[in-house]
């Protein structure tokens, strides 16, 4: 079509969910709710090669009707309908020996039914976890650029997320020590920048992939009357090695690290790393294999997190 390729498609889904949570001890409130959701999706995409490169233009249309009932009564404030169009466009070309691509996409992420549930979960006498039927879908705008030369690759990405879903804690009642934990939508857009450089050399029996990157967000939240800036970046490094040995042996050595830093309203307060090693022997033209491996040899794959919220 028009010297290019045109594709269309669609899907339809209907979901009915019912939750009946009864707590006779009255540690947490009992609840009786149900949700009906109808989702109609259609998409179209056009791609074409021209003299200076290749481009793709597309769009995705979503119509969602969500009805929420509590004790068999329709709750208008928590029921909603969506009609949205999410475009995508990309262009790729070659400049000398460098391949490059730039793309822009808009995507949506619906909250899970577990997060939308109105039931409460008793954790201990100091904390109760609850769903949130009022959660909205996340909408993320992505702008990405990728360039590659031989075995080197550089990627830059910028994301702007509206209605980002975060885990939040606040007192269940005034002057009480019990904390209510639930997911909420941020009331502001969440910008995030990421940059990665990777190399994938292959020399003789050795094949390797090294990736180094940084992810940084810009977020300020109100926590217990104070403005907290959650802007500390996180650094990531991954090194994967494989050695093809005689007699169908394959030796692998993998390493990864993640630094401290912020991700939404969670602070990762520990440097995390691991080293894995494995030796595999294959038989019968790879139809049978035996592997011996050791994971996290130095026992450094540990995490320590801090939830920043209103509690």
Regions picked out by a protein language model, each given a short descriptive name:
Residues 1, 42-48, 89-93, 143-149, ...:
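Residues on the lipid-exposed face of transmembrane beta-strands in outer-membrane beta-barrel proteins
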Residues 1-71, 94-99, 152-155, 191-214:
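Face-selective signature of the C-terminal outer-membrane beta-barrel domain
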Residues 8-10, 57-59, 89, 102-104, ...:
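Membrane-embedded beta-strand positions of outer-membrane beta-barrel proteins
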Residues 12-18, 48-52, 61-67, 93-97, ...:
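Transmembrane beta-strands of outer-membrane beta-barrel pores
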Residues 18-27, 67-75, 113-121, 126-128, ...:
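Outer-membrane beta-barrel translocator domains and adjoining extracellular loop/strand segments
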Residues 34-37, 77-80, 108-162, 179-194, ...:
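Outer-membrane beta-barrel signature, preferentially recognizing the C-terminal barrel domain
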Residues 89, 230-311:
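Conserved C-terminal beta-signal and adjacent last beta-strands/turns
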Residues 136, 142, 153-212, 220-238:
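Outer membrane beta-barrel strand-and-loop segments of large Gram-negative receptors
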């Amino acid at each position: 079509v028009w010297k290019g390729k045109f594709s269309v498609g669609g899907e339809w889904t209907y979901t009915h969910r019912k939750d009946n949570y009864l707590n006779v001890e009255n540690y947490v409130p009992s609840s009786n709710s149900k949700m009906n959701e109808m989702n109609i999706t259609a998409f179209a995409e056009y791609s074409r090669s021209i003299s200076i490169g290749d481009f793709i233009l597309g769009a995705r249309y979503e119509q969602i009707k969500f009805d929420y009932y509590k004790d068999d009564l329709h709750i208008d404030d928590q029921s909603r309908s969506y009609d949205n169009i999410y475009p995508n466009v990309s262009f790729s070309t070659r400049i000398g020996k460098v391949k490059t691509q730039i793309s822009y996409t808009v995507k949506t992420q619906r909250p899970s039914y577990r997060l939308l549930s109105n039931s409460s979960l008793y954790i201990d006498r100091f904390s109760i976890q609850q769903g949130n039927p009022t959660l909205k879908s996340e909408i993320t705008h992505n702008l990405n650029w990728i360039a590659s030369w031989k075995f080197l690759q550089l990627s830059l990405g910028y994301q702007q997320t509206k209605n980002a879903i975060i885990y939040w804690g606040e007192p269940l009642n005034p002057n009480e020590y019990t904390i209510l934990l639930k997911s909420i939508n941020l009331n502001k857009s969440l910008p995030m920048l990421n940059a990665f450089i990777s190399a994938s050399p292959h020399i003789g029996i050795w094949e390797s992939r090294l990736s180094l990157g940084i992810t940084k967000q810009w977020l300020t939240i109100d926590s217990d009357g104070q403005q907290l800036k959650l802007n500390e970046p996180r650094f990531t490094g991954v090194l994967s090695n494989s050695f093809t040995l005689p007699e169908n042996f394959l030796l692998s050595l993998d390493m990864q690290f993640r630094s401290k830093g912020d991700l939404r309203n969670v602070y990762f307060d520990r440097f995390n790393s691991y080293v894995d090693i494995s030796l595999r022997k294959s038989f019968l033209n790879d139809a049978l294999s035996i592997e011996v491996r050791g994971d996290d040899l130095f026992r450094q794959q540990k995490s320590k997190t801090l939830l920043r919220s209103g509690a």
